[in-house]
Amino acid sequence: MAVRECMAFFADVDACARVPPTALAFSKHEEFNSGAKKLGSFQAYCPHDCSAEDMGSSSFDVDDVHAIACLDIRLFNQDRHAGNLLVQRSTSEDEPSQLTLVPIDHGCCLPELEHMDETTFAWMQWPQAKLPFSAKIKAYVTSLDSFAQEEAMKQYIRPPAKALATLHVGTLLLKKCVAMGLTAFEMGQLLVRSSLAMPSPMECLVAQLKHLDPYSHIHLYLRVFEVALDKLVRRMFPRTTNVVCADNGWTIQQPTQQEFAARKSYAKVLLSSAA
């Protein structure tokens, strides 16, 4: 769990979601059951007023929620509840108070691909999750490169191979779904179980690819995964839409065949950066 806490910090490129600085630390104390050093994560303390469970979700900035949603989706977060979203309130004499969300507790991120049954996102119940991503968030997602992040991580920690595979798959999934016009809520529908006994669409997709080894052949796995994901998204959301803001409110635009054809293969983009 400690290593995954650090991986979440590295994955939050440019502190887009505001994950606090996190590092690994060894600790030893005479009161411990064992005299051996213990490894844990050490995270900068973030002063805060409360957590998201103490406030109405409509108070939060849309881009803040979307940035955290993108991080959670990439990491297949299995413990995102309102209690581990800290709320900071900034006050100014000239401006009304502003609320900022700070996500913590990422030890249950990046599960093995075969064990994603506990993926959960509190923000799926928030209205912001059903709104389209801004141009800023879209540009950020487009710039993500999990292979470059892997190299950066390896300079400081030893990330587990299975956690890295999940990061690569999650990054591809996020980039592909954002390009296809899905909202954070719709992506959540792909990853989160609708009932305890029913596997999520993502779990079913991974099960279909069990003949492939993502840990020793990640490049091949990503190529096959992208094709399967494309089919899954089109089946679940047959009229994949783009939502734009018009003068009279939110309107829906259907993508043209040319737009569908022009969409990139994000597996190729990721893999070219790893070459």
Which ranges hold each PLM region?
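ATP-dependent kinase catalytic cores of phosphoinositide-metabolizing enzymes
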Residues: M1-Q78, A82-A275
